[in-house]
């Protein structure tokens, strides 16, 4: 029997690597981690020991009757009570418990209550709790902020699901890992996924960057792995962060010929904040200038990542996404880390999903690309996503096929939303359309009212500031194809800072540029910027009539470059002085009714009547002045060049002396840059 690594022995014993590590520790064997080697003799002994234990356990299991499943802990339901419910008979109806039963149960506890008796809030809460309810007291609408209401409702849903999973923890099962591929632009993330999926993706990307997060599922040795591809460009920070929050494992791609770059550091920080394990894929090892050891040294120096083969605990796998070298080992390591992490879900309950991307599809309407985290998502399910609800009409898998059921960790596109869901919210399945509407309708109305009120106030403030301030402003209406793209464009524009110009984003949204966008741009004297969106015919016509500029882009770099040029065009030109000549005063002529005239010998360059003159005495700067008159002999001239002499009179009549040194400067207007 050859020597084996711990995880290889675990496979032979048909047990998890985590359990084997624990068993080896109890046996007193010194093994550091799953990659540690076990010698031949020890492997043989361990196989004998564990085979005997397995036989003993099998006999014991056959002799022992199967235990009854423990009764599940009751989930407390929430009930909202109004002031008029603080009467015993009304409370009984509210919680659905017979009045006589409540009176009897409370009497046993030593509390005497009458049917029409008024009770206080504490008593109402205590009674409700006895029968499995959590009482919450109604507040008038005006006292509850829109955001607080949304958070309360979503928090209630989240807590319900958490309670559900905690209650059914014995029924949780292992689900496929969700893996996010991160790294610097052009380090080979999309090419790696392309090689894994055996389809061409890299060639389809616009402008050299992945502009929307895509999720794909593959099978390796009979086990599923879900991959999320996140953009590498620095502008897509929030999209990368979203990917990290939705994932179980991060594969950090670092090019062996380029090393750790700014977005490598940023991507790793996202993974660290999300407390997600990282596997480093050192890519492009087929390149002539690839240096694996130097790349590992950078991982240590810049990220404090110590590779396993250097004594650390981070798995590093040298790969070539182009040739496919090392990819099988990378997939093996992903499955190993997933096994050690014991990634679980509750597959039988209602579905819970995380939104990777959402957009308005021209043919399907509002859609969301999601990863199912728990439960089974089915066609016909009713879903809640913040203030938006959905009856699932269609589920489309990562291969573009329509399916009926999506299982945990499966990436799917959901079709059927009333409007584009915000990627900040999770998706929860509820029991009925009525429940979905109840949770979302009021929230949606409040959001819309609040949005319109804020828009009006904000617009009035902007117009007032434009009138009162000399500082130039650029008002923008932004539209993008997805929420992720919109966020990236907002971040890009925010990076174009200037002390002279303030950028106001009057409105931003997802979808086609419409007539409302044009009217808002007109009211704020702004322009419309669209990213990967179309402009409807009516909006284009209105824009022409109103004189509103609409600029649309497909590539983020083009948008940035044009925005930069637009801002630079609004900047005041900068005055730059250019040294054009030098001279020395040889004689001072004091002429009545004229003043002092300096006789100057030009030493180099020239002097013109428009020059600024700087005066130095014994090497020390005295003052600068403008030329009042310039003469060559007795003629008024516009310009005199070295080595000629000239007579000049300054406008200020400052004290000039013989041997004073003069410098002549011409002023130019130069366009400022951001």
From Swiss-Prot:
Annotated stretches, region: G5: 320-322
Domain tr-type G: start-end pairs: 174-344
Classification via SUPFAM superfamilies: Initiation factor IF2/eIF5b, domain 3, P-loop containing nucleoside triphosphate hydrolases, Translation proteins
Chain spans, region G3: 229-232
Pfam family, one: GTP_EFTU
Chain positions recorded as GTP binding sites: 183-190, 229-233, 283-286
Keywords: Cytoplasm, GTP-binding, Initiation factor, Nucleotide-binding, Protein biosynthesis
Chain intervals for the UniProt region annotation (G4): 283-286
A Gene Ontology cellular-component term: cytosol
Segments of this protein annotated with the region G1: 183-190
PROSITE patterns in UniProt: G_TR_2
InterPro entries the record matches: EF-G-like_DII, IF2_II, IF2_N, P-loop_NTPase, Small_GTP-bd, T_Tr_GTP-bd_dom, TF_IF2_bacterial-like, TIF_IF2
Residue ranges of the region described as G2: 208-212
Subcellular location: Cytoplasm
Keyword Cytoplasm among UniProt keywords: yes
GO molecular function term, any single one: GTPase activity
UniProt record similarity statement: Belongs to the TRAFAC class translation factor GTPase superfamily. Classic translation factor GTPase family. IF-2 subfamily.
Entry function: One of the essential components for the initiation of protein synthesis. Protects formylmethionyl-tRNA from spontaneous hydrolysis and promotes its binding to the 30S ribosomal subunits. Also involved in the hydrolysis of GTP during the formation of the 70S ribosomal complex.
UniProt-listed NCBIfam families: IF-2 (TIGR00487), small_GTP (TIGR00231)
Protein name: Translation initiation factor IF-2
């Amino acid at each position: 029997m050859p020597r084996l690594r711990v995880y290889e022995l675990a496979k032979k014993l048909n047990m998890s690597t985590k359990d084997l590590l624990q068993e080896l520790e109890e046996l007193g064997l010194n093994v550091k981690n799953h990659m540690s080697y076990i010698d031949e003799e020890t492997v043989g002994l361990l196989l004998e020991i564990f085979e005997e234990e397995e036989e003993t356990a099998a006999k014991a299991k056959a002799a022992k009757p199967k235990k009854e499943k423990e009764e599940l802990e009751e989930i407390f339901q929430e009930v909202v009570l109004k002031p008029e419910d603080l009467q015993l008979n009304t409370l009984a109806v509210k919680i659905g418990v017979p009045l006589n039963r409540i009176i009897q149960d409370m009497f046993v506890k030593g509390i005497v209550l009458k049917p029409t008796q008024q009770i206080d809030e504490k008593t109402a809460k205590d009674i409700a709790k006895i029968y499995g309810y959590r009482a919450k007291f109604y507040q008038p609408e005006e006292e509850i902020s829109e955001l607080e209401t949304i958070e309360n409702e979503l928090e209630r849903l989240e807590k319900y699901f958490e309670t559900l999973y905690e209650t059914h923890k014995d029924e949780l099962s292992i689900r496929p890992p969700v893996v996010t591929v991160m790294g610097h632009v052009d380090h080979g993330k999309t090419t790696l996924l392309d090689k894994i999926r055996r389809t061409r993706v890299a060639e389809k990307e616009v402008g050299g960057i992945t502009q929307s997060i895509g999720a794909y599922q593959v099978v390796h040795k009979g086990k599923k792995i879900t991959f999320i591809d996140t953009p590498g460009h620095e502008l897509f920070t929030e999209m990368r962060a979203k990917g990290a929050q939705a994932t179980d494992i991060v594969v950090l791609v670092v090019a062996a010929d380029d090393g750790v770059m700014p977005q490598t550091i940023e991507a790793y920080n996202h993974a660290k904040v999300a407390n997600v394990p990282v596997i480093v894929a050192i890519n492009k090892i087929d390149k002539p200038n690839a240096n694996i050891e130097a790349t590992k040294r950078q991982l240590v120096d810049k990220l404090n990542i110590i590779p396993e083969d250097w004594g650390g605990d981070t798995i590093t796998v040298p790969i070539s996404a182009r040739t496919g070298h090392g990819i099988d080992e990378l997939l093996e390591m992903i499955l190993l880390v997933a096994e050690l992490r014991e990634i679980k879900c509750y597959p039988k309950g209602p579905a819970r999903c995380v939104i990777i991307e959402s957009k308005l599809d021209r043919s399907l309407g509002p859609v969301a690309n999601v990863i199912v985290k728990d439960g089974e998502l089915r066609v016909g399910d009713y879903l809640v996503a913040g203030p938006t609800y959905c009856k699932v009409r269609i589920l489309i898998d990562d291969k573009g096929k329509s399916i009926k059921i999506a299982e945990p960790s499966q990436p799917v596109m959901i079709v059927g939303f009333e409007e584009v869901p915000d990627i900040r919210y999770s998706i929860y399945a509820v029991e009925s359309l009525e429940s979905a509407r109840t949770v979302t309708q009021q929230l949606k109305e409040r959001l819309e009212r609040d949005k319109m009120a804020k828009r009006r106030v904000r617009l009035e403030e902007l117009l007032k500031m434009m009138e009162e301030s000399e500082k130039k402003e650029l008002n923008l209406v932004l539209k993008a194809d997805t929420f992720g793209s919109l966020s990236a464009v907002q971040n890009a524009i925010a990076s174009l800072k200037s002390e002279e110009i303030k950028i106001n984003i009057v409105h931003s949204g997802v979808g086609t540029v419409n007539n409302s966008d044009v009217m808002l741009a007109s009211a704020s004297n702004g322009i419309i910027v669209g990213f990967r969106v179309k402009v409807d015919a009516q909006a284009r016509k209105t824009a022409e009539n109103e004189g509103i500029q609409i600029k649309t882009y497909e590539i983020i770099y083009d948008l940035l470059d044009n925005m930069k040029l637009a801002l630079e065009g609004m900047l005041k030109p900068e005055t730059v002085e250019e040294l054009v000549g030098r001279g020395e005063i040889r004689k001072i002529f004091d002429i009545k009714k004229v003043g002092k005239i300096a006789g100057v010998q030009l030493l180099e360059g020239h002097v013109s009547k428009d020059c600024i003159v700087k005066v130095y005495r014994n090497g020390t700067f005295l003052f600068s002045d403008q030329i009042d008159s310039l003469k060559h002999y007795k003629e008024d001239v516009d310009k005199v060049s070295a080595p000629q002499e000239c007579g000049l009179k300054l406008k200020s009549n400052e004290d000039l002396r013989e041997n004073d040194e003069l410098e002549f400067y011409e002023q130019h207007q130069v366009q400022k840059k951001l």
